[in-house]
Amino acid sequence: MKTCKLMFLTFSLFLVTVCFQKTIGQSIVALKLPGMDNVIVKKDIPYIKTSDSTLKMDVYYPPNFDFKSKIPAVVCVFGYTNKGQIKAVGKQLRKFGQYTSWCKVIAASGFAAIAYETINPENDLISLMNYINANSGNLYIDARRIGAYSCSANTPVALENILNSSNSFFKCAAIYYGIFLDKDFKYLSTIDTLSRNMLFIPSRLPESTTWKKDVPLLIVHVGKDFVPHTDESLTGFIDKAINQKVPFTLIHYATGIHGFDAYTDNEETGQIIRTTIEFWKYNLKQ
């Protein structure tokens, strides 16, 4: 029985991968804002340099940004390794249309947007945060006003960091069709096996009694997610978040699919994306 469940889950994620690969040219966020085509992009900024490798990030700035003052930023947080990203969509996520267009939407809304490459997602996220803190002046980013965007199997890494009591970097986060991995989640072994195949990091949530309680979350759940067990992972998380008084807003997109922000161009999708932008503006005090 367990083998059948694993095969079904693997097949479902295979369908996600095929869907992404077949629609790479169409993977653009379903919201067009004025100025998106004129945002300023600084590519391939090294944020880690070691004897073995150099990891880079791209920073998107609003159109006509004068580089005279610091602005709030939103980081696209990744949980797939570079190899996993290429396996899933054929290229690094920072170069994938869904994320380049998200970064343009974010920048056109008045923020800086950051997307980066990663070999070790958990450690590299910490290195990225340290780099931004140390270089906020040169980057023209207000390190006191940083938000996050993360979706799908990227979200365990994001949530592990954001809910950690030591987090002083992220001030809010938008989580789209995510996976919430408590230590007692009954499908952990299945997710772990899947993560080894798909090359994403199944980070565990911290112990709920230690969750950071001043980082608002915007959670967007979809009713037609064909990735199994996302419903169970969310309901378990919501119960604990309420008990621990973690601030969150839940949007249940009843007819939404996994990847709706790039693959479902309709008014409801557009409204959810606009709500996400307003969420960042409010919590980052833009």
Map each language-model feature to its residues.
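The feature captures the conserved acid-bearing segment of alpha/beta-hydrolase catalytic domains
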Residues: 172, 178-244
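Alpha/beta-hydrolase active-site loop
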Residues: 98, 119-137
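Gly/Ser-rich "nucleophile elbow"/oxyanion-hole loop immediately N-terminal to the catalytic nucleophile
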Residues: 69, 130-152, 164
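N-terminal cap/lid segment of alpha/beta-hydrolase-fold proteins
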Residues: 26-69
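Short beta-strand element of the alpha/beta-hydrolase
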Residues: 68-81
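C-terminal catalytic histidine-bearing segment of alpha/beta-hydrolase fold enzymes
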Residues: 235, 242-286
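Short glycine-enriched nucleophile-adjacent loop
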Residues: 155-166
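Short amphipathic alpha-helix adjacent to the substrate-entry channel of hydrolases
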Residues: 88-113
